From Swiss-Prot:
One record GO biological process: monoatomic cation transport
Gene3D superfamilies linked: 1.10.287.70, 1.20.5.300, Helix hairpin bin, Jelly Rolls
UniProt site (Central gate): F392, V396
Tissue expression summary: Prominently expressed in retina.
The protein's name in its UniProt record: Cyclic nucleotide-gated channel alpha-3
Chain residue ranges for the region called Ion conduction pathway: 298-406
Binding-site residues, 3',5'-cyclic GMP: G548, E549, S551, R564, T565, D609
Species this protein is from: Homo sapiens
Region (Selectivity filter): 365-368
Impact upon substituting A469T: In ACHM2; the dose-response relationship for cGMP-activation is shifted toward a lower cGMP concentration; the left shift in the dose-response relationship of the mutant CNGA3 is less distinctive than in homomeric channels with this mutation indicating a partial rescue effect of the CNGB3 subunit; is in large part located in the cell membrane at 37 and 27 degrees Celsius
Function: Pore-forming subunit of the cone cyclic nucleotide-gated channel. Mediates cone photoresponses at bright light converting transient changes in intracellular cGMP levels into electrical signals. In the dark, cGMP levels are high and keep the channel open enabling a steady inward current carried by Na(+) and Ca(2+) ions that leads to membrane depolarization and neurotransmitter release from synaptic terminals.
The UniProt record lists the keyword Disulfide bond: no
């Protein structure tokens, strides 16, 4: 047992009684328990001490204390005093001090460690033993922490389905199958009794499997996230509340009503009691919409989707026709289904195929069907004709629009070719050149290079345009040496300015001595560096090669200036990316440091190839650039125009005053009066006034 150090002892403790009765000990323990119950916080330091001291006192017997018992009792009183001081301190400080709300986790941990260290001075061993003796205290101390951890764990474990993810689309595929199953087979089973009775076990298994998927779909919908101000909401309570406010929630609940219980009364040969399962049709439409968005052939999918809708309508109409025939009586007249007592018409397959044939003829208004006889038959045929007209109009309209959309790009491209042909015929272009033009258009169409990228991307925001350009062109631009270490912002600016260009076989991209206004990056194709005769090839450039980057930088001291130093010719059809000098300089205006770095890289490349005159470079380094001079001239011209406009206005004002003065003098001479005209008075007004007075 550890001893109490003298620095923690108190002089009054030397007057403790040597003999202490059991009543006194019980009174002390009861007082401690009352103090513990009245305190608002868990005294983790006091409880181990009480446990150890009371155990030691009980073991020491009912007689007088030994020296060890006195030490234990002293330690107990010391713990009581320290606990009381801490309790008073916490009451003075307040239960929720303002700085603790903003104190970080590290500061809180440090403060708690300091308080625990002060509480555990000289009593580390009893505290360790007390933890095992007081498991309830440990539980009380960590209650709040455990609750917070459980909440965090629940938040982490909460599964939220992203409606744009592949997992959600797969689930849509899974739930669309039972919905389509119910829409196609429920009506068929309800109208054709043999189909329901002969395969009853199969239908029961499929029906309740579909019900299980329906229930799971409700859970998925309750955990499906939605966007709020562009952010995905993942709070499960908000998701559930949002789902409950939708109309689909009511339809989902109605589709899960256990109407199958009616089987107990009417029997299992009435599957129409499950017609409430048809209310989940929105899942099927959602699956079709998302598939149309994901597929690479949306027009073909729309046509297939339209055909599927028409087939379902024809199928339902056929089943209803057979049900009406059964209600009226098979074979009672020429309009209803023939008598099923005839073996040929009693087969299930013949019943369905005959009904489907009649429905197709009626809805498409093709061919002749037996005329109706009874009033209900007339009403049904009238409704069928109206539905058939609607179907015909839908087919014509949708198929026509789909075909026009599919051929829109082809028609637009063909219109361009026709206009070019008419122009060449009007200008009497040679057949050879006309053939080259037509072949160039054929190459563009065959390689799908007819799309105008700017026209396609103009509806997108600048951020998405930049991301698409980075995804398409950034790797290509990084191949150029001078752009490899550039800032990311400059590269983004440059990729937005790259323009695709196509050259025909034999076309010159540049000739020796031409002024360099663009640089080129080969995306696809082969170019040849040829001699002046255009035949001798020095080197062949392939995909990924680039040229012309030095000539668009205007590097001072370059022996060739900004002129081309070689002849480059296209061997076949070549697809290049072009970056003009104006676009580069426009992008570099916001990145002056990058401009200096690019010029330095270009200068090093020229020095390596011995294509730079250092004296000329040093001599041309002091004067300002030509662009700066042009800007200064432009600003000076604006100033001169402003001054000239001001002088012109002053001249006009002076002229107006002179004219007014001359008019006054003229009126005075003619009228003989000495009174001058007032400002703004028209000559002759004074004379008119005098005449009126006379």
């Amino acid at each position: 047992m550890a001893k109490i150090n003298t620095q923690y002892s108190h002089p009054s403790r030397t007057h403790l009684k040597v003999k202490t009765s059991d009543r006194d000990l019980n009174r002390a323990e009861n007082g401690l328990s009352r103090a513990h119950s009245s305190s608002e916080e868990t005294s983790s330091v006091l409880q181990p001490g009480i446990a150890m001291e009371t155990r030691g006192l009980a073991d020491s017997g009912q007689g007088s204390f030994t020296g060890q018992g006195i030490a234990r009792l002293s330690r107990l009183i010391f713990l009581l005093r320290r606990w009381a001081a801490r309790h008073v301190h916490h009451q003075d400080q307040g239960p929720d001090s303002f700085p603790d709300r903003f104190r970080g986790a590290e500061l809180k941990e440090v403060s708690s460690q300091e308080s625990n260290a002060q509480a555990n001075v000289g009593s580390q061993e009893p505290a360790d033993r007390g933890r095992s003796a007081w498991p309830l205290a440990k539980c009380n101390t960590n209650t709040s922490n455990n609750t917070e951890e459980e909440k965090k764990t629940k938040k982490k474990d909460a599964i939220v389905v992203d409606p744009s993810s592949n997992l959600y689309y797969r689930w849509l595929t899974a739930i669309a199958l039972p919905v389509f199953y119910n829409w196609y087979l429920l009506i068929c089973r309800a109208c054709f009794d043999e189909l329901q009775s002969e395969y009853l076990m199969l239908w029961l298994v499929l029906d309740y499997s579909a019900d299980v998927l329906y229930v799971l779909d409700v859970l998925v919908r309750a955990r499906t996230g939605f966007l709020e101000q562009g952010l995905m909401v993942s709070d499960t309570n908000r998701l559930w509340q949002h789902y409950k406010t939708t109309t689909q929630f009511k339809l989902d609940v109605l589709s899960l009503v256990p109407t199958d219980l009616a089987y107990l009364k009417v029997g299992t040969n009435y599957p129409e009691v499950r017609f409430n399962r048809l209310l989940k049709f929105s899942r099927l439409f959602e699956f079709f919409d998302r598939t149309e968005t994901r597929t690479n052939y949306p027009n073909m999918f729309r046509i297939g989707n339209l055909v599927l809708y028409i087939l379902i309508i024809i199928h339902w109409n056929a089943c209803i026709y057979f049900a009406i025939s059964k209600f009226i009586g098979f074979g009672t007249d020429s309009w209803v289904y023939p008598n099923i007592s005839i073996p040929e018409h009693g087969r299930l397959s013949r019943k369905y195929i005959y009904s489907l044939y009649w429905s197709t003829l009626t809805l498409t208004t093709i061919g002749e069907t037996p005329p109706p006889v009874k009033d209900e038959e007339y009403l049904f045929v009238v409704v069928d004709f109206l539905v058939g007209v609607l179907i015909f109009a839908t087919i014509v309209g949708n198929v026509g629009s789909m075909i026009s959309n599919m051929n829109a790009s082809r028609a637009e491209f063909q219109a361009k070719i026709d206009s070019i042909k008419q122009y060449m015929q009007f200008r009497k272009v040679t057949k050879d050149l006309e053939t080259r033009v037509i072949r160039w258009f054929d190459y563009l169409w065959a390689n799908k290079k007819t799309v105008d990228e700017k026209e396609v991307l103009k509806s997108l925001p600048d951020k998405l345009k930049a991301e698409i350009a980075i995804n398409v062109h950034l790797d290509t631009l990084k191949k150029v040496r001078i752009f490899q270490d550039c800032e990311a912002g400059l590269l983004v600016e440059l990729v937005l300015k790259l323009r695709p260009t196509v050259f025909s076989p034999g076309d010159y991209i540049c000739k020796k001595g031409d002024i360099g206004k663009e640089m080129y990056i080969i995306n696809e194709g082969k170019l040849a560096v040829v001699a002046d005769d255009g035949v001798t090839q020095f080197v062949v450039l392939s995909d990924g090669s680039y040229f012309g980057e030095i000539s668009i930088l205007n590097i001072k001291g370059s022996k060739s200036g900004n002129r081309r130093t070689a002849n480059i010719r296209s061997i076949g059809y070549s697809d290049l990316f072009c970056l003009s000098k104006d676009d580069l300089m426009e992008a570099l205006t916001e990145y002056p440091e990058a401009k200096k770095a690019l010029e330095e890289k270009g200068r090093q490349i020229l020095m390596k190839d011995n294509l730079i005159d250092e004296e000329l470079a040093r001599a041309g380094a002091d004067p300002k650039d030509l662009e700066e001079k042009v800007e200064q001239l432009g600003s000076s011209l604006d100033t001169l125009q402003t001054r000239f406009a001001r002088l012109l206005a002053e001249y006009n004002a002076t002229q107006m005053k002179m004219k007014q003065r001359l008019s006054q003098l003229e009126s005075q001479v003619k009228g003989g009066g000495d009174k001058p005209l007032a400002d703004g008075e028209v000559p002759g007004d004074a004379t008119k006034t005098e005449d009126k007075q006379q």
